[in-house]
């Protein structure tokens, strides 16, 4: 009997089961203990294979692939700390709804807690963050293949969002020629191998339910808050709100076109919040709101009803409003709750939004990060997509820009970490095949610098803008102690990225003005390669510009 051969047959059942649940992309890191899984994945023609030497980046690559494909994405890693490196991506997926299938190779039980190399306690190591966790036994023919496949099917068939951790122990030998060991065990699944459906099929979730009193509420004064959603949903939400005559406050990830732009500026004006107090109902579509003033207003508003519609389960309301948590696909929910044509009830807010945008435009000439945030829509590639980093850059774009309705925007706004942003952007590009503009800060780029290796493999032009303000300048917006701000919060690194781009053979530009930036973009969009554009700006100008605009708009 060949242990290595049966390990591979066991792994082949697992991998084939994944294909029945829509898994097409599979991300693989190097490792020996994961050999059965890796070889089974390599032999399965249903998969598109992605590789990376860094497991943390690999997890975020899978996250980006899942964001665009809307399908589960599998990850294969070896045992030990390689597994722990998947934690950040798993946490993010749990908060933003992407489906990740983590296949973690492990030592067999007799090698745990006895000093064996690269052997740690992997079952349960992700605590409550996976939606499902499976600790498989050591491969053995004593367990029927139908148990293995139905176990996988149950976890994936009931997975609506987040990650599944499947821990897979394998005993040595891991290498060797294939023989007939376990062939009859595998063949007991019969014509399942020729089929394309799961062995065990779970009943789907109930469809969205119509709120029977919607006809009553749609005649009231309402406000629509749009959070993270798809591009198609964003366009539908914008039309829905316009028909109702309700003001739409659109987040940077809403893709609604933000018909009332610069919301994070005008929400600081007492006239706006006073008018919003007249709202009888607030309908929030999508979660993960970005703007500070929006979150402050959302926490303080007290309408008669506050509805939150999102496909992700959970409360999603840190302000704990009285109202309804409606778990539904946004587009489906809109169809069940049609808008009735009514005149807009807000008068002051459209005027304030226009004045706020004019205040931003008046400052657009200076070469800085706030101005770049405002101008970002000018640089979007046609038929492309935008990936926005975290920290200061996403807040500036949210507050100062107006993105086109229906233009795809992606980000990691669940846990909002700066880890893995370049890797996620790589996954977003690979899954879509579209020209991509990604924008991050210098610390975010440093954090995930080795992901530049992933950006060597793109199928369409990708431009990575690194806004180098020399540190974590978001802390300039916070009341951090002035005496310790630089040492313990900003942490300036005094680095430039030209040599990093050269190390990975990526094109590089360092524009000094808007004309040079436009020339760099024109060059970058010509070829299906990655271009790094480093925009060096004065350290605190972006934060100061935002603060000045907030003060100005608050007194309009």
Swiss-Prot record:
A GO molecular function annotation here is: manganese ion binding
Pathway assignment reads: Quinol/quinone metabolism; 1,4-dihydroxy-2-naphthoate biosynthesis; 1,4-dihydroxy-2-naphthoate from chorismate: step 2/7; Quinol/quinone metabolism; menaquinone biosynthesis
One GO biological process this protein is involved in is:
menaquinone biosynthetic process
Q: What class of enzyme is it?
A: transferase
Cofactor(s) recorded in Swiss-Prot or TrEMBL: Mg(2+); Mn(2+); thiamine diphosphate
Catalytic activity line of the entry? isochorismate + 2-oxoglutarate + H(+) = 5-enolpyruvoyl-6-hydroxy-2-succinyl-cyclohex-3-ene-1-carboxylate + CO2
Keywords in alphabetical order = Magnesium, Manganese, Menaquinone biosynthesis, Metal-binding, Thiamine pyrophosphate, Transferase
**What superkingdom heads the lineage?**
Bacteria
Q: List the disulfide bonds.
A: none
Checking InterPro entries in the record gives:
MenaQ_synth_MenD (IPR004433), MenD_middle (IPR032264), THDP-binding (IPR029061), Thiamin_PyroP_enz_TPP-bd_dom (IPR012001), TPP_enzyme_TPP-bd (IPR011766)
Q: What is its EC number?
A: 2.2.1.9
Tell me the cofactor note.
Answer: Binds 1 thiamine pyrophosphate per subunit.
- CDD domains of this UniProt entry? TPP_PYR_MenD (cd07037), TPP_SHCHC_synthase (cd02009)
Question: Which family would the database say this protein is a member of?
Answer: Belongs to the TPP enzyme family. MenD subfamily.
Role: Catalyzes the thiamine diphosphate-dependent decarboxylation of 2-oxoglutarate and the subsequent addition of the resulting succinic semialdehyde-thiamine pyrophosphate anion to isochorismate to yield 2-succinyl-5-enolpyruvyl-6-hydroxy-3-cyclohexene-1-carboxylate (SEPHCHC).
Outline the subunit composition: Homodimer.
This protein is called 2-succinyl-5-enolpyruvyl-6-hydroxy-3-cyclohexene-1-carboxylate synthase
């Amino acid at each position: 009997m060949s242990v290595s051969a049966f390990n591979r047959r066991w792994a082949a059942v697992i991998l084939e089961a994944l294909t029945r649940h829509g898994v097409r992309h599979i991300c693989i890191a190097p490792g020996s203990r994961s050999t059965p899984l890796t070889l089974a994945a390599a032999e399965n023609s249903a998969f598109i294979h992605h590789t990376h030497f860094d497991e943390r980046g690999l997890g975020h690559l899978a996250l980006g692939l899942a964001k665009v494909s809307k399908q589960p994405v599998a990850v294969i890693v070896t045992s030990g700390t390689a597994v722990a490196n998947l934690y950040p991506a798993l946490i993010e997926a749990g908060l933003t709804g992407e489906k990740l299938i983590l296949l973690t190779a492990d030592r067999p039980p007799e090698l745990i807690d006895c000093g064996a190399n690269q052997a740690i306690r992997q079952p349960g190591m992700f605590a409550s963050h996976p939606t499902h966790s499976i600790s498989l036994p050591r491969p053995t023919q004593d367990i029927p293949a139908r148990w293995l496949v139905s176990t996988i099917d149950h976890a994936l068939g009931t997975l609506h969002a987040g990650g599944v951790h499947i821990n897979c122990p394998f005993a040595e030998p891991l290498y060797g020629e294939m023989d007939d060991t376990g062939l009859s065990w595998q063949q007991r699944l019969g014509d399942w191998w020729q089929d394309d459906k799961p062995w065990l099929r779970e009943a789907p979730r109930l469809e969205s339910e119509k709120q029977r009193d919607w006809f009553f509420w749609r005649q009231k004064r309402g406000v629509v808050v749009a959070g993270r959603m798809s591009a198609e949903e964003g366009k539908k939400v914008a039309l829905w709100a316009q028909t109702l005559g309700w003001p739409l406050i659109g987040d940077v990830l809403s893709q609604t076109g933000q018909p009332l732009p610069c919301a994070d500026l005008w929400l600081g004006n007492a006239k706006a919040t006073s008018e919003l107090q007249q709202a009888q109902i607030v309908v929030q579509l999508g979660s993960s709101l970005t703007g500070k003033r929006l979150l402050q207003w959302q926490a303080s508003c007290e309408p008669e009803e506050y509805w939150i519609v999102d496909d992700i389960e959970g409360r999603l309301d840190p302000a704990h409003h009285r109202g309804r948590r409606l778990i539904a696909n946004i587009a489906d929910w809109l169809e069940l709750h049609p808008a009735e044509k009514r005149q807009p009830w807000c008068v002051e807010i459209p005027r304030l939004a226009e004045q706020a945008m004019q205040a931003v435009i008046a400052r657009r000439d200076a070469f800085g990060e706030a101005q770049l945030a405002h101008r970002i829509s000018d640089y979007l590639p046609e038929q492309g997509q935008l990936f926005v980093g975290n920290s200061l850059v996403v807040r500036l774009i949210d507050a100062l820009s107006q993105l086109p309705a229906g233009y795809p925007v992606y980000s990691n706004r669940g846990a909002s970490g700066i880890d893995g942003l370049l890797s996620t952007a790589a996954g977003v590009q690979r899954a879509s095949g579209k020209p991509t503009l990604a924008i991050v800060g210098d610390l975010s780029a440093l954090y995930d610098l080795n992901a530049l290796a992933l950006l060597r493999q793109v199928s369409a032009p990708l431009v990575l803008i690194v806004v180098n303000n020399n540190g974590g300048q978001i802390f300039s917006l916070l009341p951090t102690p002035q005496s310790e701000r630089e040492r313990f919060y900003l942490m300036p690194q005094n680095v430039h990225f030209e040599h990093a781009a050269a190390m990975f053979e990526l094109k590089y530009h360092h524009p000094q003005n808007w004309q040079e930036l436009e020339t760099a973009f024109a060059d970058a969009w010509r070829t299906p390669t990655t271009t790094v554009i480093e925009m060096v700006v004065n350290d605190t100008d972006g934060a100061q510009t935002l603060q000045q605009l907030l003060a100005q708009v608050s007194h309009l």
